């Protein structure tokens, strides 16, 4: 009677009750970070769905239909920047705001801007700043296209 191992990968898809603030898909391979982001957003009235990596994000994004997606950069199977590129190239998710929550290098910030990431938040992050950035991205006008000044502001969050 030893310990039983669970099969890998174990889906982390989870869902809470609907809310009025918006639905956020949180993608991070670190379970503690996923929970930290989830709890902070749920306390502010957001509905949160989680995924353990970019591949899982792409599997569930069309069922979840989030108002915003947070992505870590370094993840197994499919990293955050490649996931962002695939989300931007899909007409069904091209307009969903993307927030990178990661300890990014300048090169990763530039690569993120190139694939259409909307904002960056450095780890460790201030929970109030997380909520502020998520709210501002969800409340931005639909179809808002970043201008040159917006790219500099987005990079400033890294």
PLM regions and their residue ranges:
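Short hydrophobic/Thr-rich beta-strand motif most characteristic of the beta2 strand and flanking loop
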Residues: 45-52, 60
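Receiver (REC) domain active-site loop signature in two-component systems and cognate sites
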Residues: 75
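Alpha4 helix (beta4-alpha4-beta5 surface) of REC/receiver domains from two-component response regulators
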Residues: 82, 104-121, 128-136
């Amino acid at each position: 009677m030893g310990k039983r191992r669970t099969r890998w990968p174990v889906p982390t898809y989870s869902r809470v009750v609907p809310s009025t603030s918006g639905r956020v898909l949180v993608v991070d391979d670190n379970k503690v970070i996923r929970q930290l982001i989830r709890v902070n957003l749920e306390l502010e009235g957001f509905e949160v769905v989680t995924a353990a990596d970019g591949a899982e994000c792409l599997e569930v994004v069309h069922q979840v239909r989030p108002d915003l997606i947070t992505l870590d950069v370094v993840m197994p199977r499919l990293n955050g920047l490649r996931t962002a590129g695939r989300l931007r190239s899909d007409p069904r998710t091209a307009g969903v705001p993307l927030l990178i929550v990661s300890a990014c290098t300048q090169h990763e910030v530039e690569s993120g801007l190139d694939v259409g990431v909307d904002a960056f938040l450095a780890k460790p992050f201030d929970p109030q700043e997380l909520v502020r950035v998520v709210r501002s991205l969800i409340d931005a006008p639909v179809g808002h296209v970043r201008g040159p000044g917006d790219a500099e502001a987005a990079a400033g969050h890294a």
